[in-house]
Swiss-Prot record:
NCBIfam families: PRK00011.1. PROSITE patterns: SHMT. The record marks 228 as: Plays an important role in substrate specificity. This is Serine hydroxymethyltransferase. It is found in: Cytoplasm. Pathway: One-carbon metabolism; tetrahydrofolate interconversion; Amino-acid biosynthesis; glycine biosynthesis; glycine from L-serine: step 1/1. Belongs to the SHMT family. The modification N6-(pyridoxal phosphate)lysine is found at residue 229. Its EC number is 2.1.2.1. It is an enzyme of class 2 (transferase). InterPro entries: PyrdxlP-dep_Trfase (IPR015424), PyrdxlP-dep_Trfase_major (IPR015421), PyrdxlP-dep_Trfase_small (IPR015422), Ser_HO-MeTrfase (IPR001085), Ser_HO-MeTrfase-like (IPR049943), Ser_HO-MeTrfase_PLP_BS (IPR019798), SHMT-like_dom (IPR039429). CDD domains: SHMT (cd00378).
Length: 417
């Protein structure tokens, strides 16, 4: 018999302790992983609702189970808000993740063995854009494009490779690139060879929704995103298009269900609906502009302190600190900063001589600190502390001093005030 007063603390104290410890970690650590963010209590309320009990295979109005009249309302709200947010005429909000959204696009548009042009993972791409260890690299013939010596996407190389290999699909988007992508140029190249243009905007979806980064939806045949990261919603995925192609939309829907998934997670879709509504508010635009402002402020300090930033700066929410030539690996930098309650991730940089498990760089992003209320002043102060540690990563006194400063700053800017 279920009762409303059932709780984890009494029933499963071991699990409850882990949850409490993670909650404390989030409050007492500065989160700089570019793909992480804090979602709102409203989103978490939706995810913790009784919608989690409902199976709803199919799509609104076309379900395989009864009793779906209310979850149809929930999913329709999410769909319509996603379309409004990004200027799309089609949205599928069922993908459980960004990677599953991407796999659905591959399934809808390609056959195994087809040629795909995607950004090199070592140059800032994503696993699902053709990495040999991922389904994309195993099932398809991947031709990687990259960045030039300035750290910017090399569109001349992209066009040359496209003309030479004639891929059926080109992929735009990234996981560690700090520049602006020219979506119109990519579409021009795709049209030249008769290829689909697929954009994975997961990292910059929030910036795009707020109008502070170019929107790929008018240019691409299909666009995917996660719903967390800069969008600050629940962990999940979404597929969008403005191609006005009903045949394409049917292929995409079929590739999600029944092609790759069964029942959608209705409680997560409710969380997506809330997040999309939040992203339509004026304050969301203010937040996203501050995300970019904070990233630029951090880059300024890194450069002043003599650190190299891949591409020399940032136009979005992230930066890649290049440690090649320094007596410090990305793994060591990650660990040293972590000891001071600053969370980053080690990351490969272009022409990295070290393995992906060690790396010669760290990736840093500003969505989470901006969500806490950091502005340029705090971002610059924090970057100075990071440089202090990177300058002397084996010095416990420096790490302990910075940790104290971090704890004081976190106390001033609680995640959930």
């Amino acid at each position: 018999m279920l009762k409303k007063d059932m709780n984890i603390a009494d029933y499963d104290p071991e699990l409850f302790k882990a949850i409490q410890n993670e909650t404390l970690r989030q409050e007492e650590h500065i989160e700089l992983i570019a793909s992480e963010n804090y979602t709102s209590p409203r989103v978490m309320e939706a995810q913790g609702s009784q919608l989690t009990n409902k199976y709803a295979e199919g799509y609104p109005g076309k379900r395989y189970y009864g009793g779906c009249e209310y979850v149809d309302v929930v999913e329709t709200l999410a769909i319509e808000r996603a379309k409004e947010l990004f200027g799309a005429t089609y949205a599928n909000v069922q993908p459980h993740s960004g990677s599953q959204a991407n796999s659905a696009v591959y399934m809808a548009l390609l056959k195994p063995g087809d040629t795909v042009l995607g950004m090199n993972l070592a140059h800032g791409g994503h696993l699902t854009h053709g990495s040999p260890v991922n389904f994309s690299g195993k099932l398809y013939n991947i031709i990687p494009y990259g960045i030039d010596e300035s750290g910017k996407i090399d569109y001349d190389e992209m066009e040359r490779l496209a003309v030479e290999h004639k891929p059926k699909m080109m992929i735009g988007g990234f996981s560690a690139y700090s520049g602006i992508v020219d979506w119109a140029k990519m579409r021009e190249i795709a049209d030249k060879i008769g290829a689909y243009l697929f954009v994975d905007m997961a990292h910059v979806a929030g910036l795009i929704a707020a109008g502070v980064y170019p929107n790929p939806v008018p240019h691409a045949h299909v666009v995917t995103s996660t719903t967390h990261k800069t969008l600050a919603g629940p962990r999940g995925g979404v597929i969008l298009s403005a191609a006005d192609d009903e045949d394409l939309y049917k292929k995409l829907n079929s590739a999600v269900f029944p092609g790759g998934q069964g029942g959608p997670l209705m409680h997560v879709i409710a969380g997506k609906a809330v997040a999309f509504k939040e992203a339509l508010e004026p304050e969301f635009k203010v937040y996203q502009q501050q995300v970019v402002n904070n990233a630029k402020a951090m880059v300024e300090v890194f450069l002043e302190r003599g650190y190299k930033i891949v591409s020399g700066g940032t136009s979005n929410h992230l930066m890649l600190v290049d440690l090649i030539g320094r007596d410090l690996t990305g793994k060591e930098a990650d660990a040293a900063l972590g000891s001071a309650n600053i969370t980053v991730n080690k990351n490969s940089v272009p022409n990295d001589p070290r393995s992906p498990f060690v790396t010669s760089g760290v990736r840093i992003g500003t969505p989470a600190i901006t969500r806490r209320g950091f502005k340029e002043v705090e971002s610059k102060e924090l970057t100075g502390w990071i440089c202090d540690i990177l300058d002397d990563a084996s010095n416990p006194a420096v790490i302990e001093r910075v940790k104290g400063q971090v704890l004081a700053l976190c106390a001033r800017f609680p995640v959930y005030g």
